[in-house]
Amino acid sequence: MEQAPEDQGPQREPYNEWTLELLEELKSEAVRHFPRLWLHSLGQHIYETYGDTWAGVEAIIRILQQLLFIHFRIGCQHSRIGITRQRRARNGASRS
């Protein structure tokens, strides 16, 4: 008869602690890249939509992750990640 394996890995934090820590990290990163008024408005929208629930926490985490990903991908001046815009040669020569 098979038995479920015992948990041999490291003890994991409870989901709610991990989620709140992730939210704090995302908020501190978002404040460096977006106007506080935008972030405040986003928080108000989430609160009005979800109230004070875990669904709201999960929604704001998802939105902040998406915003930061797109922001870095487009090319944040603070980041090494992103699309580098190459200047075109004036004589029409292409770099292939």
Swiss-Prot record:
Keyword RNA-binding: no
Any matching Pfam family: VPR
Residues in the signal sequence: none
Major place of residence: virion
Keywords recorded for this protein, A-Z: Activator, AIDS, Apoptosis, Cell cycle, Host G2/M cell cycle arrest by virus, Host nucleus, Host-virus interaction, Ion channel, Ion transport, Modulation of host cell cycle by virus, Phosphoprotein, Transcription, Transcription regulation, Transport, Viral penetration into host nucleus, Virion, Virus entry into host cell
Gene3D superfamilies assigned: 6.10.210.10, VpR/VpX protein, C-terminal domain
Coiled coil ranges: none
GO CC terms, sorted: host cell; host cell nucleus; host extracellular space; virion component
Cellular compartments annotated: Virion; Host nucleus; Host extracellular space
Transmembrane segments: none
Modified residues (Phosphoserine): S79, S94, S96
Region described as Homooligomerization: 1-42
Posttranslational mods: Phosphorylated on several residues by host. These phosphorylations regulate VPR activity for the nuclear import of the HIV-1 pre-integration complex.
GO biological process, any: monoatomic ion transmembrane transport
Recorded family membership: Belongs to the HIV-1 VPR protein family.
Subunit structure and binding partners: Homooligomer, may form homodimer. Interacts with p6-gag region of the Pr55 Gag precursor protein through a (Leu-X-X)4 motif near the C-terminus of the P6gag protein. Interacts with host UNG. May interact with host RAD23A/HHR23A. Interacts with host VPRBP/DCAF1, leading to hijack the CUL4A-RBX1-DDB1-DCAF1/VPRBP complex, mediating ubiquitination of host proteins such as TERT and ZGPAT and arrest of the cell cycle in G2 phase.
Miscellaneous note of the record: HIV-1 lineages are divided in three main groups, M (for Major), O (for Outlier), and N (for New, or Non-M, Non-O). The vast majority of strains found worldwide belong to the group M. Group O seems to be endemic to and largely confined to Cameroon and neighboring countries in West Central Africa, where these viruses represent a small minority of HIV-1 strains. The group N is represented by a limited number of isolates from Cameroonian persons. The group M is further subdivided in 9 clades or subtypes (A to D, F to H, J and K).
Biological role: During virus replication, may deplete host UNG protein, and incude G2-M cell cycle arrest. Acts by targeting specific host proteins for degradation by the 26S proteasome, through association with the cellular CUL4A-DDB1 E3 ligase complex by direct interaction with host VPRPB/DCAF-1. Cell cycle arrest reportedly occurs within hours of infection and is not blocked by antiviral agents, suggesting that it is initiated by the VPR carried into the virion. Additionally, VPR induces apoptosis in a cell cycle dependent manner suggesting that these two effects are mechanistically linked. During virus entry, plays a role in the transport of the viral pre-integration (PIC) complex to the host nucleus. This function is crucial for viral infection of non-dividing macrophages. May act directly at the nuclear pore complex, by binding nucleoporins phenylalanine-glycine (FG)-repeat regions.
Protein name, entry field: Protein Vpr
Natural source organism: Human immunodeficiency virus type 1 group M subtype B (isolate RF/HAT3) (HIV-1)
Lineage: Viruses, Riboviria, Pararnavirae, Artverviricota, Revtraviricetes
